[in-house]
Amino acid sequence: MGLCSRYKSLTCNSCSMHCQIMPEESPRLQYCANSCFCMWPEESSYFNRGVVEGILTKNHNARLSGYIFVDFSVSFLRLFLEKDWIDYLASTDMGIVLVSDRNMQSLANYWRKHNSAISAVIYNDDGLDVANEKIRQLFIGRYLSFTGGNTLTQMEFTIMGYMVSGYNPYQIAEVLDMDIRSIYAYKQRIEKRMGGKINELFIRSHSVQH
């Protein structure tokens, strides 16, 4: 289906020029001596300001090799249940850091497990000191293998995707050729991992229009 155009803008924030990285690279980039870092989606203004003020300004002496900091919050749940976003960001060859809220931790861990382009996850309960240490380690070239908390399984991810897309449990059972009781059991496990009812999380998330 492809990524919605509203999410295709990716801008470098390493200096005041704010050169465009995607969808078309600014010609100025070839003359830039700064390593690049971006915040995405760009409509998350409070998130973007918080990352710059809370994390990146405290690590300005570290080596920036090019990173995208992703607002991995429930506001973008529907976006993160498709693979278009990670394929698009990974095409930049920059490292990807997920900054997860409380509800999205198990989904962030799922993507961390299944895509090597994701360098690290910063969790809601990490605190500024822990977050800064993770970023410092990344910026000096260390590999961070640790993930905290639960991780959605492939089947849980698939079933949640169907539910958020509007399928009811009976339709999902038919599509996946599973017993209806198994679907309800998966639904309970998903909601436990996500820390909330799927319907409530769906309501809190933005629509994804193509």
From Swiss-Prot:
InterPro entries: Sig_transdc_resp-reg_C-effctor. One of its GO terms (molecular function) is DNA binding. One of its GO terms (biological process) is regulation of DNA-templated transcription. To E.coli YkgK. This is Uncharacterized protein YqeH. It comes from Escherichia coli (strain K12).
